[in-house]
Curated annotation (Swiss-Prot):
It comes from the Eukaryota. This is Endo-1,4-beta-xylanase B. It catalyses: Endohydrolysis of (1->4)-beta-D-xylosidic linkages in xylans. Its EC number is 3.2.1.8. Induction: Expressed in the presence of D-xylose under conditions of acidic ambient pH, probably under the regulation of the pacC transcription factor. Repressed in presence of glucose through the action of the creA transcription repressor. Belongs to the glycosyl hydrolase 11 (cellulase G) family. GO terms for molecular function: endo-1,4-beta-xylanase activity. The active site is at residues 117, 208. The gene is xlnB.
Length: 221
């Protein structure tokens, strides 16, 4: 999910330059502390970090497949480590995930032709992200039941720029912050429900925050 914030600065009609307000200084300082959006490689893994610029979020790559993220009063961000391109592999991860409000820990990725954004949600905060979509069915995998949903995003940010696209969701009923995800099971279940993926782009174990605060430390393998 993506939200955007706007900033309106009032100017005084005087001949001398007005001193910046305490609010504008604080907002500029907050922006300077936050990690900018970026992609690349770190520790032998692909990483992706995206933020809409709202609030304070610090994403830090560690050794190997590890990373940390701390966020305060954010708009929306998503970041993590994995692979580019993704595949129908089994992904192991471990760590801590402590959202205060709305946040997700998931296997997260994109495909093209068709353009699909997908989530295999392992844990979430106080909001189940799948419930905003349409429930399609369930899947038994990796020791739990996953509820499967679809949703449509219109004129939203994507790997192809602003676009309209479909989201696929598998949301684990028993939350966890470590384990293995057999992605093939999800891809097969989606296909059986008529949910067709395209050609894999990147695939990461991601932390996402939306209008919330929190912290996480994750290692991917």
């Amino acid at each position: 999910m993506v939200s955007f914030s706007s900033l309106l600065l009032a100017c005084s009609a005087v001949t001398a330059f007005a001193a910046p307000s305490d609010q504008s200084i604080a907002e500029r300082s907050l922006s300077e502390r936050s990690t900018p959006s970026s992609t690349g490689t770190s520790g032998g893994y692909y990483y992706s970090f995206w933020t809409d610029g709202g609030g304070d979020v610090t994403y830090t790559n560690g050794d190997g497949g590890s990373y940390t993220v701390e966020w305060t009063n954010v708009g929306n961000f998503v970041g993590g480590k994995g692979w580019n391109p993704g595949s129908s592999q089994t992904i192991s991860y471990s760590g801590s995930f402590n959202p205060s409000g709305n946040g997700y820990l998931s296997v997260y990725g994109w495909t093209q032709n068709p353009l699909i954004e997908y989530y295999i949600v392992e844990s979430y905060g106080d909001y189940n992200p799948g419930t905003a979509g349409t429930h399609q069915g369930t899947l038994e995998s990796d020791g739990s039941t996953y509820d499967i949903y679809t949703a449509t995003r219109e004129n939203a940010p994507s790997i192809e720029g602003t676009a309209t696209f479909t989201q696929f969701w598998s949301v684990r009923q028993s939350k966890r912050t470590s384990g293995s995800v057999t992605t093939q099971n999800h891809f097969d279940a989606w296909s059986q429900l008529g949910m067709t993926l395209g050609t894999h782009n990147y695939q990461i174990v991601a932390v996402e925050g939306y209008q919330s605060s929190g912290s996480a430390s994750i290692t991917v393998s």
